[in-house]
């Protein structure tokens, strides 16, 4: 099971020494080809899904962060890879809140998306809700909706 645990301070613009703390585990099929964490030419640090070309977690040189987990449900086939959600956010300088508004959520199998930029930490799932900003506290995200 993919699991992300994170702690975020209410005022991340203050940028204290530890304004964002992350623990993450990716649980994927062993036979799915991947490349280990490395700097992409586009300027972010992430592993790479060699099957679909995206990534599940990454951070840019300027501190922007993105991660995605699957949403537990019967498998569905979609044209768009969930790994592109992370990749596209990190490759563009759009604000997290604006990026979430541009997504065609129905194009993807079930997902939970976590983004961080200069405006804060943002969460969106295509299996419930319109997305939300997470201002503080310790939160955990797995294969179901986050409870804030």
Describe each region flagged by the PLM:
Residues 1, 35-37, 45-47, 90-94, ...:
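A short linear-motif detector with a strong N-terminal bias
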Residues 3-7, 55-59, 110-116, 122-123:
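Short beta-strand scaffold segments in enzyme catalytic cores
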Residues 64-143:
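Internal, conserved structured core segments that host functional sites
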Residues 6-11, 53-56, 99-102, 130:
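Intrinsically disordered, low-complexity boundary segments flanking structured domains
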Residues 10-85:
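Glycine/small-residue-rich interface belts in oligomeric ring/scaffold proteins
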Residues 1-2, 19:
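Extreme N-terminal starter segment of soluble prokaryotic enzymes
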Residues 146-148:
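Conserved small/polar residues in nucleotide/adenosyl-binding loops
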């Amino acid at each position: 099971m993919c699991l992300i645990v994170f702690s975020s301070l209410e005022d991340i613009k203050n940028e204290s020494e530890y304004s964002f703390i992350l623990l993450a585990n990716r649980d994927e099929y062993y036979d799915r080809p991947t490349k280990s964490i490395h700097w992409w030419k586009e300027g972010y640090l992430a592993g790479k899904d060699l099957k679909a070309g995206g990534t599940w977690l990454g951070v840019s040189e300027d501190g922007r962060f993105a991660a995605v987990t699957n949403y537990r449900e019967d498998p569905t086939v979609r044209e768009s890879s969930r790994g592109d959600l992370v990749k596209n956010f990190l490759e563009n300088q759009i604000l997290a809140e604006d990026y979430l508004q541009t997504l065609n959520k129905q194009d993807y199998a079930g997902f939970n998306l976590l983004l961080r930029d200069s405006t804060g930490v943002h969460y969106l799932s295509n299996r419930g809700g319109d997305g939300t900003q997470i201002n503080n506290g310790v939160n955990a995200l797995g294969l179901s909706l986050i409870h804030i």
